[in-house]
Amino acid sequence: GNEIADSTVSLVKFIKPDPDAIFSSTCFGDTVSSDPAFSIPIKQESCKNTCSSALFKGSQSANPFPFMDGSYFAFMDDKDYYSLSGILGPPVSSFGDGFEGNGFSNQSLNVAIKQETEDSSFYPENNMPSSAIVGVNSCGQSFHYRIGAQGTISLSRPLNRDQSFQNLSSFPPMSSLVESWKTQSELAQNTLSSRRNDGFPVPGYIPENMSSTTLRSMSTGPSRPSKVCLVCGDEASGCHYGVVTCGSCKVFFKRAVEGKCSRQHSYLCAGRNDCIIDKIRRKNCPACRLQKCLQAGMNLGARKSKKLGKLKGVHEEHPQQPLQQTPTASPKEDTTLTSSSKEPSANSNSLVPLISAVSPAITLSAAVILENIEPEIVYAGYDNTQPDTAENLLSSLNQLAGKQMVQVVKWAKVIPGFRNLPLEDQITLIQYSWMCLSSFALSWRSYKHASSQFLYFAPDLIFNEERMRQSAMYDLCQGMQQISLEFSRLQLTFEEYTLMKVLLLLSTVPKDGLKCQAAFEEMRVNYIKELRKVLLKSPHNSGQSWQRYFQLTKLLDSMQDLVGDLLEFCFYTFRESQALKVEFPAMLVEIISDQLPKVESGIAKPLYFHRK
């Protein structure tokens, strides 16, 4: 009735009820219980049945990865900026009749995979083929950590817990928590009061038994934030030299680079080349300001690029190169069909003409596609003039997470096979995995750009030891850093990282199953096989691919434990956001409002590769 429609209005707006075509009956009949949040019947589109019987009769589409269709990459729309279903949109029509689950080549996986005994905490194996890889019984070193609020972590060095938060497993009362955060209270209060004009709501106190509909209704729909300069954080005037910047940084970069070419300027930093560059202090150190311009991607050759919407950031895989150096091609760039030193990403339209120029006879592998759709790094726009108090740091992290979630949804919708799932299943998987994806990407950035010594949330928001303690989540920060250190120890490759991230997207499901559980299981097994195939082809493994697979899947299981503690802390600050003065953007309000009651009621079920 009206109550169900109100509770799902922002997530399933594109779903049309049809009493004659109930979608859930096309999967396993009535054996799979539907999620109460999506209990309305789903209209089944003709020629778009992602769970048709053809999947189980062995028929496959001629081209399981239809990347020649331009609509497949048409994900740069801004419709409903803060809604998951608005970004995901209705199912695309370019996927054809069949599900692309069998599109992964498994020629090198003819040997049967040994499975672990069935257990309630493992990946469901009912009605699965014998080739389904759901875990391994293997010897070797275990990298399974119990991290964060509800346990301890084994680190190479002892942990010095923050004295104000020695036991996060039993959160302190609200009054004592507020008192411990009120260092420099007057300055922090003035800063926060001025920052509430940025369009992001501050939810009030939320009781334990409040429904997701009421949770979501407490937030107001904010206007989309304006563009900010990626160098100093001031209001941007346009896209200058390929990067969204203000007029001051535009003029500075032009004069600095042209003067450097003519040897009129030779900037030197009086400190350690790590000066803070913001709106107030941008003129203090020209050397660090120029360095930040180059790191943001400014280039004199891009002066003709005037479109404001094309924001250029720092890419995950390639470190920043000085402007005067000539980029050299690497083997990875040759195999990913790119023509420049920078890989295309989910925020770039450059991939569309590249894919269109490829001969239709060429079928790209899933691993290559994942490398090309990987999102770029998002800037936090952190105000370095404000004090590093817990409320300021956590509010900035929440706003950054809201921006990253928009990228995560756009990334998910172009993952091969994901759009073949019902819209409700897509939304459910994103809601259950958003924290896992964010922390996993954070560990990768910290590994690539900070040598795992700091937490690289954004180029303008990096957590050192002091900021970790100030954030009131020191133990959790240490846990995320430990994952990054494992990346460094294992020398994780970008190809492995992208495949593991997809598996994390597919690693938490409702206990009663998804709307189309069979399609989900087929997709997950295919990506596990793809990871195995990548490990077999890697020359660095030299016959030790199973040991490598064991280590990587152990690391994925460790992420589940870490994320459980991160969610507990996130839900706590969400409920106490008004008292703690922690801001949440509307995107996170929507996701957490729907996720919180499901997780706390035990509906969510993590899928592990190994016995706990």
Swiss-Prot record:
<keyword id="KW-0804">Transcription</keyword>
<feature type="binding site">
    <location>
        <position position="246"/>
    </location>
    <ligand>
        <name>Zn(2+) 1</name>
    </ligand>
</feature>
<dbReference type="InterPro" id="IPR000536">
    <property type="entry name" value="Nucl_hrmn_rcpt_lig-bd"/>
</dbReference>
<feature type="zinc finger region" description="NR C4-type">
    <location>
        <begin position="269"/>
        <end position="293"/>
    </location>
</feature>
<feature type="binding site">
    <location>
        <position position="573"/>
    </location>
    <ligand>
        <name>21-hydroxyprogesterone</name>
    </ligand>
</feature>
<dbReference type="Pfam" id="PF00104">
    <property type="entry name" value="Hormone_recep"/>
</dbReference>
<dbReference type="InterPro" id="IPR035500">
    <property type="entry name" value="NHR-like_dom_sf"/>
</dbReference>
<feature type="DNA-binding region" description="Nuclear receptor">
    <location>
        <begin position="229"/>
        <end position="298"/>
    </location>
</feature>
<feature type="region of interest" description="Modulating">
    <location>
        <begin position="1"/>
        <end position="228"/>
    </location>
</feature>
<keyword id="KW-0863">Zinc-finger</keyword>
<dbReference type="InterPro" id="IPR001723">
    <property type="entry name" value="Nuclear_hrmn_rcpt"/>
</dbReference>
<comment type="similarity">
    <text>Belongs to the nuclear hormone receptor family. NR3 subfamily.</text>
</comment>
<dbReference type="GO" id="GO:0008270">
    <property type="term" value="F:zinc ion binding"/>
</dbReference>
<feature type="region of interest" description="Hinge">
    <location>
        <begin position="299"/>
        <end position="349"/>
    </location>
</feature>
<feature type="binding site">
    <location>
        <position position="285"/>
    </location>
    <ligand>
        <name>Zn(2+) 2</name>
    </ligand>
</feature>
<keyword id="KW-0805">Transcription regulation</keyword>
<dbReference type="GO" id="GO:0030518">
    <property type="term" value="P:nuclear receptor-mediated steroid hormone signaling pathway"/>
</dbReference>
<keyword id="KW-0862">Zinc</keyword>
<keyword id="KW-0446">Lipid-binding</keyword>
<dbReference type="GO" id="GO:0005634">
    <property type="term" value="C:nucleus"/>
</dbReference>
<dbReference type="GO" id="GO:0000785">
    <property type="term" value="C:chromatin"/>
</dbReference>
<feature type="region of interest" description="Important for coactivator binding">
    <location>
        <begin position="410"/>
        <end position="413"/>
    </location>
</feature>
<dbReference type="InterPro" id="IPR050200">
    <property type="entry name" value="Nuclear_hormone_rcpt_NR3"/>
</dbReference>
<feature type="binding site">
    <location>
        <position position="404"/>
    </location>
    <ligand>
        <name>progesterone</name>
    </ligand>
</feature>
<feature type="binding site">
    <location>
        <position position="269"/>
    </location>
    <ligand>
        <name>Zn(2+) 2</name>
    </ligand>
</feature>
<feature type="compositionally biased region" description="Low complexity">
    <location>
        <begin position="339"/>
        <end position="348"/>
    </location>
</feature>
<feature type="binding site">
    <location>
        <position position="445"/>
    </location>
    <ligand>
        <name>aldosterone</name>
    </ligand>
</feature>
<keyword id="KW-0963">Cytoplasm</keyword>
<feature type="binding site">
    <location>
        <position position="573"/>
    </location>
    <ligand>
        <name>progesterone</name>
    </ligand>
</feature>
<keyword id="KW-0479">Metal-binding</keyword>
<feature type="binding site">
    <location>
        <position position="288"/>
    </location>
    <ligand>
        <name>Zn(2+) 2</name>
    </ligand>
</feature>
<feature type="binding site">
    <location>
        <position position="229"/>
    </location>
    <ligand>
        <name>Zn(2+) 1</name>
    </ligand>
</feature>
<feature type="binding site">
    <location>
        <position position="445"/>
    </location>
    <ligand>
        <name>21-hydroxyprogesterone</name>
    </ligand>
</feature>
<feature type="binding site">
    <location>
        <position position="404"/>
    </location>
    <ligand>
        <name>21-hydroxyprogesterone</name>
    </ligand>
</feature>
<feature type="binding site">
    <location>
        <position position="398"/>
    </location>
    <ligand>
        <name>aldosterone</name>
    </ligand>
</feature>
<feature type="binding site">
    <location>
        <position position="573"/>
    </location>
    <ligand>
        <name>aldosterone</name>
    </ligand>
</feature>
<feature type="binding site">
    <location>
        <position position="275"/>
    </location>
    <ligand>
        <name>Zn(2+) 2</name>
    </ligand>
</feature>
<dbReference type="InterPro" id="IPR001628">
    <property type="entry name" value="Znf_hrmn_rcpt"/>
</dbReference>
<protein>
    <recommendedName>
        <fullName>Mineralocorticoid receptor</fullName>
    </recommendedName>
</protein>
<keyword id="KW-0675">Receptor</keyword>
<feature type="region of interest" description="Disordered">
    <location>
        <begin position="310"/>
        <end position="348"/>
    </location>
</feature>
<dbReference type="GO" id="GO:0005496">
    <property type="term" value="F:steroid binding"/>
</dbReference>
